[in-house]
A protein has these predicted regions:
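A conserved hydrophobic position in a structured secondary element of the catalytic/binding core
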Residues: 125
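Cell wall/extracellular polymer interaction/catalysis modules
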Residues: 1-120, 128-146
Length: 146
């Protein structure tokens, strides 16, 4: 069981539509909060989330859009270091990743949920389920959203 975007699935996602993109996607590295948990068991590259990490969600910033950034007040972004536990485990889904198109959508992650509340376009799982999946997936694993 998982949560998806508040407005469902979309074959033509746009920034801010609260929809999860449909398709087959590669996944990125695992980002995790090492101050809250030990490094998970996985073959994915594991990156510790620090207070200065963000993900640019500003379609007007062509250079940084839909990329990991150092938090900067001048760049619109999603903070990865949060008070809640949503991003204690986070895997970016490679949607709009290689040939980034401004406004097509950013910050599409696999992250944690406590109550399966709808997301802003991500896939959210309970921690216990994501930890099981992390043991099974590899760098070349793809996710199919349909």
């Amino acid at each position: 069981k998982c949560s998806i975007g508040k407005n469902g699935l979309s074959k033509s996602k746009i920034e801010g539509d609260l929809k999860t993109p449909v398709g087959i996607f590669s996944i990125e590295h695992l980002y995790y909060r090492n101050d809250r948990m030990e490094k998970p068991i996985t073959t994915l590259k594991c990156i510790k989330i620090d207070k200065n990490m963000g993900w640019c969600d500003d379609p007007l910033n062509k250079e940084k859009y839909n990329k990991l950034i150092k938090v900067n007040k001048k760049i619109k972004h999603e903070k990865l270091y949060r008070r809640d536990h949503k991003y204690d485990l986070l895997i970016p889904i490679k949607y709009n990743f290689v040939k980034r198109v401004a406004g097509k959508g950013s910050c599409i992650f696999i992250h944690l949920t406590k109550n399966y509340a709808p997301t802003a376009g991500c896939i959210a799982l309970k921690k216990k389920d994501l930890l099981i999946i992390l043991k099974l997936i590899k760098k070349n694993t793809k996710i199919k959203i349909y």
